[in-house]
Amino acid sequence: MLPKLKISAFLLKRLERVKQQSSGCLYGVFYGDGTLLLLSFNLSNVGQLNYEQIQHRFPAELDLCGLVKFGDCTDAEAHLNEVIKSVDITDNPILLKCELGTLVGMRASFFVHGKLEEVPYDVMDSEQLYNDFCFTRLQCGFYLQTAATPECVAKEMHVLRKRVADGNLVFKVPHTNIYIHSCGPMDNKLRGESRINDLVQAIPIPSGKENVVADKKKSKTAAQTQLAKHFGATGCEYDLINIDVMRIRTRDLLARDSPPHPALSIAVTTEEQTRAQVPLEIEAMAMLCKNTKLQRLYDVLIESICRALRLFEQSLNEHLAESEGGSLAVPRSHHFYPQGFGHFLSCAYLEGLGDDEPIMQERRKRLHRQFSLPVTRPYFRRANQCHFQGEVDDAPWTPLLNTHVGVRPSAVTDGKEYLVNGNYHYYHYLQQQVQDKGWGCAYRSLQTICSWFVLQGYTNAPIPTHLEVQKYLHKINDKPSSFVGSSQWIGSTEISMCLQGFLKVDSKILHVSSGAELPTIASELAMHFQTQGTPVMIGGGVLAHTIIGVDYCVQSGEVKFLILDPHYTGADELATIQIKGWCGWKSMDFWSKGSYYNLCMPQRPILY
């Protein structure tokens, strides 16, 4: 019986954007009673497949399952037999045939007894994905004692993977008494026949946070549970299960309580070969259908560790091949959640190799090409890595994220929405104990804009404070010394200066002689959100706001603006902010007809 085929809506959008003849590999999850869900693809190098370089970057359970062909590419047929031999999760590998730049005419076929059999498919949208699937994230540590040769690294990594798979590890779900070992789960209520969803429901929400969730819940999709809000990745709506790792002999935590020392230690063995003891801090992920039986979880977690070790091995051996003298370095796991993918990807980067070094730039460029991503914006820099909510909550304070999600519609007849592209934090009056009511609105708009560049991975610079802004403007001779420490407001020109000074970001300044003329720049704002996607600061008189979208009807000229209002002075309660209109759609009567307005429109740097 052939598998039932489903395709992620995220994947379909990515396939639609490919406009060059090419071929590549497909990756998916096999779950339930015979359903294959396609989630991702990569493009192959000209004339050869490269899935062996790619597959360890995916979470465990997200595996090679077939081939995709774009246009009249002839490589696909040549590679089909190779892929068929390498697919493990199904006896019927899949072939997708896509036209260039469109989903019209896309055909899906399973390979059955040496022939292709065309099959229908269903589309799984984002809400169903978030409902039906979750991720695990575990952290553990090992030491790798090896000589600085690819052969020795491969040999010792193989030994280490065998140790991982020998049944001596036990997994524990934090904040519970639930243990997972090679014979199944150990808990009074959960059994091997229990489902992953039962485990999700058994994980308690940290005390004191339930009310916060209730306040924010109205703006989230129904699929997003409290577990996603408290432990998931920033900007990601999947539930996430954290896992601790223990050895069955000692019950000692391998990772969270005692991570390995981050330095290399050197030893000389009797083999007359210098060996280094490399600390490996593993951070591994897996993707699971929530209806999966709990008895499978142990094997999946073991595979996630082994997959992370293979990624470390690949990174170490690449470095040994490229570096003169063959030196070892400490690898680190970095997880990414690229916008529009609908799944995580992992990279292993070596300590001591900065993001701007040519060798790192070349590796990222290769990743961009393999995943059909533009090389005009960052996806895999360290600053792009995921921030997980449990870790973010440990910080003294974090602003609200993406406050526009869930706002009431604009009600523009036949309008089209153009929105900020990516994540941002909402900054407003009185945050961080700064008494800036009446003068700090533009500073707050600047902080919101800076947060966008941080969260999109363009920089990891800290968000500038009011005082830092004032000191910088004095430093460049824009303001007198009396400005530093004052309560004087700033405008769009100063915002553009600060963006250049703090982030090296250029800005475009638009001038409008009155609020009544704002509709004349609606199309320009729409183009800005399509091409740049950054928040826009608008200043008029002594007031500043942040524009994060427009809804515009070309035929009628009707336009509304999606506004973040920095003048809000209340608590960070999302429901209040949306209901009271501090974040929401504003019509033309929001703007003063007698005031001129300047808009600071930040431009994305070309960076990857």
From Swiss-Prot:
InterPro entries xrefs: Papain-like_cys_pep_sf (IPR038765), UfSP1/2_DUB_cat (IPR012462), UfSP2-like_N (IPR049387)
Coiled-coil stretches: none
Enzyme Commission code(s) on record: 3.4.22.-
UniProt keyword list: Hydrolase, Protease, Thiol protease, Ubl conjugation pathway
Active site as annotated: C441, D565, H567
GO molecular function, one term: deUFMylase activity
GO CC list: endoplasmic reticulum; nucleus
Any one of the GO BP annotations: proteolysis
Protein function: Thiol protease which recognizes and hydrolyzes the peptide bond at the C-terminal Gly of UFM1, a ubiquitin-like modifier protein bound to a number of target proteins. Does not hydrolyze SUMO1 or ISG15 ubiquitin-like proteins.
Entries under PANTHER family matching the protein: UFM1-SPECIFIC PROTEASE 2
Family per similarity comment: Belongs to the peptidase C78 family.
Protein name as it appears in the record: Probable Ufm1-specific protease 2
Organism: Drosophila pseudoobscura pseudoobscura
Source lineage: Eukaryota, Metazoa, Ecdysozoa, Arthropoda, Hexapoda
